[in-house]
Amino acid sequence: MHRRNFIKNSSIASAGFAILPSGTLFANNKIVKVGVIGTGLRGQDHLELLLKRKDTEIVAICDVDEGMLLMAKKLFIDAKKPLPTIITGSNVAYEDLLKIAAIEAVIIATPWEWHAPMCIAALEAGKYVGTEVVLGTTLQQHWDVVQAAEHYKGHVMMLENVCYRRDVMAILNMVRQGMFGELIHLQGGYQHDLRGVKFNDGKTPYDSGVEFGAKGYSEAKWRTNHSMLRNGDLYPTHGIGPIAHFININKGNRFLNICSFASKAKGLHQYVVKKGGNTHPNAAVDFKLGDVVTTSINTANGETILLQHDTNLPRPYSLGFRVQGTNGLWMDINNSLHIEGVTEKHRWDKAQSFLDKYDHPLWKKYSNDAEGAGHGGMDFFVVNAFIESVKRKINTPMDVYDAATWSAITPLSEQSIQLGNQTIEFPDFTKGKWMYNTPIFALGDDY
């Protein structure tokens, strides 16, 4: 069955099929043959990591941007590695990459609107799929990817690197050891001034002008269009991924309801006017994305979650994590925590000594390997987990149900805002399997 007909015609008779559980096959010496779809700046990060590994061979790369392909080729030359097959020419050129039988796994690092169709095509081709966030742009796309993974018995891992951030993993270790007691409330989000990413001069990627779309470069070429046309939490997974692990979402717990609010939208217009002047054509653009989008979620086990998306205003970077339980809490903004009976009453304590004490076994084992990898080492861990899963032919530690659940917050938040901040029932992508699944993420120091 061709994927173009799959979504339309299939009734997904295998809707009850469970993604294959982790196995025991260990293949340390195996060389994984990889294809990379999307060689923009993020795709190049993945290429650099893969080129440093002894257990991967990059067979082919694909992009429609000749300039980005040239930059990607230089990475191979600098690493003294053979050049891969280079595939380009059209928006569907990736289909030719997927026809290469030798490729076992693909990494997708393209604009968001391409993630879902590329995931489905890769699943049909029998490849392991590692996709950059987000999974899709519509709720139906999320269901389509889940159903394709079930139908083709495939694996999709969202490459959410913040799940591997060192402090986040130490807190996960503390949560699992009961240091915070029973968890009650969690917060997180994406709070990052992206104005200099959403606009540039069309030649350099950051802080260089006020162009976007056809006149933009790199992310400004496509990402800003979402801020112009959509209003919701467009990038929820950096916050919700770690939170989901803290409270075992899809592994004995699930999201029940979601409600979102958006502030007025002023930041992007003001940025354009300040840098480009009132007469610049982009000063007349009506950006739909609220400057601060706030989302509330409740869960089957009774926790509450608060997410914030804040990318249009001047601010320092912070994901705004808060993990609060019956024994105390941690907040990342001031790197502080309070644990009843351990820290001084009614006072914050610096978190670092606790983070050191409860450093996750993965970081203890691989910190030297992660040194120099992107985003403070997080990128090493997320790519390593994906490649190790392919080598062992097992399910990935963050699976297609996780990808869909975390990423679906975007279209659900849009829907809630469009309906006047209505509370919406959260879909169960696992179709009840969440009640029987158990945690598999980062249980030891393996991967």
Predicted stretch roles:
Residues 284-297:
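Short N-terminal edge-element motif at the start of the domain
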Residues 1-131, 143, 147-155:
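N-terminal glycine-/serine-/threonine-rich beta1-alpha1-beta2 phosphate-ribose binding loop
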Residues 10-13, 45, 244, 259, ...:
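C-terminal helical cap and adjacent loop that interface with cofactors, partners, or active-site loops
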